[in-house]
């Protein structure tokens, strides 16, 4: 025989409520979770402890209808921030662009003002787009995890693949520094090889 979920009293067959405590026979279903709330919950799992910061930035971007916003961490850490947040393709692209530009400067003896202007433009491009790129990366990663992970492991996998990776940040920052060091010597190497 069935018992009340709240007080444990035996229920009569077909009873809608418990005779002892008066609660409905079945507990009320949990309120439905909106797709938007579930999406934000998964973004919070992916981003980690800094989620409130990014949620505010993304909400402001959405409210203002803008695709760009300022990211101080990206401004100061540049390629290191891209690596820390897992934006590896963008980090490699930025390193390659900076490498080519630095090498071209050496070959053509470009004035330092041009070099400085290029550095400012590249830095602003990364800094202003970092929040948008990170959200796109998070959403793409979450979708890929949902498509491939076993149903009971999705949340754990989202949390594992998200967050920050300081080793990747340091590694990409060092790769960037080494690439610029190498690019600085390309003109000298070319002159020696002639």
Where do the PLM segments sit?
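Short hydrophobic/aromatic segments of transmembrane alpha-helices and their interfaces
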Residues: 1, 71-74, 116-117
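Cys/His-rich metal-coordination motifs, chiefly Zn-binding "fingers/knuckles"
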Residues: 1-31
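Hydrophobic residues in alpha-helical segments
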Residues: 11, 83-84, 138
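Short glycine/serine/threonine-biased micro-segments
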Residues: 20, 84, 114
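Transmembrane helix recognition focused on a "late"/terminal membrane span
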Residues: 27-63, 98, 102-194
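Membrane interfacial helix-start motif at the N-side
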Residues: 53-90
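Central hydrophobic cores of alpha-helical transmembrane segments
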Residues: 91-99
């Amino acid at each position: 025989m069935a018992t009340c979920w709240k007080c444990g009293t035996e229920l009569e067959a077909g009873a809608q409520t418990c005779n002892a405590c008066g609660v409905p026979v079945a507990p009320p279903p949990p309120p439905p979770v909106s797709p938007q709330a579930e999406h934000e919950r998964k973004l919070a799992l992916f981003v980690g402890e800094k989620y409130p910061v990014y949620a505010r930035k993304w909400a402001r971007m959405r409210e203002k209808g803008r695709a760009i916003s300022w990211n101080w961490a990206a401004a100061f850490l540049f390629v290191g921030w891209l690596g820390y947040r897992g934006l590896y393709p963008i980090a490699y692209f930025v390193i390659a662009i900076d490498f080519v530009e630095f090498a071209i400067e050496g070959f053509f003896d470009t004035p330092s003002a041009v070099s400085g202007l290029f550095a400012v433009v590249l830095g602003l491009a990364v800094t202003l787009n970092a929040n948008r790129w990170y959200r796109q990366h998070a959403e793409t990663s979450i979708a890929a995890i949902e498509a491939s992970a076993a149903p009971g492991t999705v949340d754990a996998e989202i949390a594992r693949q998200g967050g920050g990776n300081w080793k990747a940040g340091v590694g990409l920052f060092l790769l960037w520094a080494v690439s610029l060091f190498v690019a600085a010597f390309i003109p000298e190497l070319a002159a020696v090889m002639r």
